[in-house]
């Protein structure tokens, strides 16, 4: 087991004991779980069927940044939780030391859907842009692969690696899942999707994972996506369209060029329902004929909403965009930290989100 890191800061253990009994309580549900030595808060929760908010599982995206109500945590040697406010922890990396209680309103008092591993048959592939393929898969209905809008699953590769993709469709119990796969030249999986994957092929998948989900609040919503970060946002829209209209929602989708908005007509249809659900495309590289918004997508949001104190933001896609949006909105536009929900797509290393 790696040696624990000594960190002199509130809410972080100064010294770890391998023999102590480690327990984590999720408030306000009151769920208490025993943690094995060296196991993270998130690993413990997922293993028991609970889904705290999370995304990358590597300490990079900060989607799992959670307030510590009492107790302390430690981190693996060499890991520094940069940018984490005092009194908070990254549950994907944090290890409870003794008794720890964290604030996680998304955790219910009853375990949620279990993680399963199953074969999945390719139903269809559709090239929707120069580098994005929409893949539909059929998981056996009796496999118990029950997901919620906003979650993702892993495809298990023959070399032992895995790649993660968000479901872009609404869950309906049919076992059908849809991915939006962007091809990267040096990727382990996406080039195969782009060049060779065909209907009838079999893949091995594991999931569902992720705590990215629409809250039960009645606050207005900003849906923020870059690139294929549109996929989990589309799942939220398809599942909760009426709720989002009732709350008031604005969908901002940023891409480089117009042709990169691979589901433009679908997104525009969402925004055709009047002021209660608007669609604002934003291009960073546009031609002369583009009359819409330009620049960075999170900056377009900031221009339109100087005060976000009474709103919620759901951001998906490039981690640089997600991080910039979080920093800008919380520091300069009064968005509460707990009102920023994210699913950052990390493209390399052990647990990538929407990886190549």
Say what each PLM segment does.
Residues 88-112, 201-203:
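Short, structured interface segments
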Residues 206-219:
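A short, basic/flexible loop-to-alpha-helix module at the beginning of a structural domain
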Residues 150, 229, 318:
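Short, conserved phosphate/pyrophosphate- and ester-handling motifs at nucleotide-, phospho-/glycolipid
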Residues 234-242:
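Histidine-anchored nucleotide/phosphate-binding helix
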Residues 114-202, 220, 255-257, 282-286:
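Ferredoxin-reductase
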Residues 1-100, 248-356:
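Reductase modules of NAD(P)H-dependent flavoproteins
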Residues 69-72, 105-107, 158, 208:
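Short, surface-exposed secondary-structure boundary micro-motifs
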